[in-house]
């Protein structure tokens, strides 16, 4: 990424141990639908002050210019900014740093990781009072806490999710003769934990641990089969699964039938639900593995009206990976200058190298 973080998720348990030693009650809270609910007009409020920005709406203010650019990215909508780009991460920090600033006089103990808050207090009353002030500070920027994830609990509490701690502690030694048995036990437990914690990304975590291994472990098809199962059940695990499988492209190319079935099934399942990330990763994997896309797979992707997925299809056509290249002819309609300001502006912007 172009923008990094000072702390990774792996560092959270040790940081929690440090600040939780300073109180008896823990306030946990996060912002509901954070990126989709960001009000673009609040960007100049955060950069220049709310009162000043409301009195000065011209482009001479950087915040107003960013506000307009964000609206142009979202079909003119004032609610929501794109999820994923580093620019959005930076804008999120600009907003929530101002929220932090409004609370700084209270000398709070704890941390904020993106939009997740964990703060400690000596008494429950202090925690509830701080919760009220946090809600008030967020409301100034049109943001709200998620009531289902906001709570005050007595300390001590677990430093990390029990399922994550268990999977992290399981031994996996790729160079050992015991590795095959370790692998079976690891994924058996991961599948069991995924059923016990259906709202958590258990299989994504399991696949991610495999992807971080430095030694090539795919001498055995079983490892690949287990990873494919993870992606079939939890499509969010697909990037980590692909990172593992594509580490050995020659081996991946020998299992094209299995991978084609996986990727096509993910596209067919998630395209009608407009799950852009899952579909985009699947199409990208087809490009990387040179797997052809049938009309049956392409049609629901076009109906998503998603520029990133459409551009990936155009790249597939350029590589000769579409069974029917004419399936994409309808994208020619998005070539007018006006389309640069509509919801599919990215497709229009990139039209020349792909459509002409």
What residue ranges belong to the model's regions?
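Extended, Lys/Arg-enriched charged tracts that mediate electrostatic binding to polyanionic substrates
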Residues: 1-7
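Catalytic-core helical/loop segments in enzymes performing group transfer/polymerization on anionic/lipid-linked
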Residues: 9-11
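Conserved polymerase palm-domain catalytic core
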Residues: 14-114, 119-135, 141-143, 171, ...
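Conserved catalytic core of two-metal-ion nucleotidyltransferases
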Residues: 84, 141-172
